[in-house]
């Protein structure tokens, strides 16, 4: 999972999408955000695929 950070915004390679998920919860009401760039991101559950880590499509 390789990302590039430009001005506090992480971008991916042109053919990649930034995928983040907030489904992992080790403690109640404390979601752990998992994010990274991937070639194959599937939007299922609470996962979202975006062009940047701010999730603007």
From Swiss-Prot:
Disulfide partners: 3-19, 12-37, 41-49, 50-55
Family membership noted in the UniProt record: Belongs to the three-finger toxin family. Short-chain subfamily. Orphan group XX sub-subfamily.
KW Secreted (keyword) present: yes
A matching Pfam family: Toxin_cobra-type
Keyword Secreted attached: yes
Record's function text: Anticoagulant protein that prevents the activation of factor X (F10). It acts by potently inhibiting the extrinsic tenase complex (ETC) (IC(50)=116.49 nM), a complex composed by active factor VII (F7a), tissue factor (TF) and F10. In addition, it shows weaker activities on other complexes. It weakly inhibits F10 activation by inhibiting the intrinsic tenase complex (IC(50)=4.05 uM), a complex composed by active factor IX (IXa, F9a), its cofactor factor VIII (VIIIa, F8a), and their substrate F10.
Native organism: Hemachatus haemachatus (Rinkhals)
Note: Negative results: does not show activity on procoagulant, anticoagulant and fibrinolytic serine proteases such as FVIIa, FXa, FIXa, FXIa, FXIIa, alpha-thrombin, kallikrein, activated protein C (APC), plasmin, urokinase, and tissue plasminogen activator. Does not induce hemolysis. Is classified as a P-type cytotoxin, since a proline residue stands at position 28 (Pro-31 in standard classification).
Major localization listed first in the record, in broad terms: secreted
CC terms in the record's Gene Ontology section: extracellular region
Source lineage: Eukaryota, Metazoa, Chordata, Craniata, Vertebrata
Record keywords, A-Z: Blood coagulation cascade inhibiting toxin, Disulfide bond, Hemostasis impairing toxin, Secreted, Toxin
Cellular location(s): Secreted
Tissue/organ expression: Expressed by the venom gland.
GO molecular function, one term: toxin activity
The protein, known as: Exactin
InterPro entries, alphabetized: Snake_3FTx, Snake_toxin-like_sf, Toxin_cobra-type
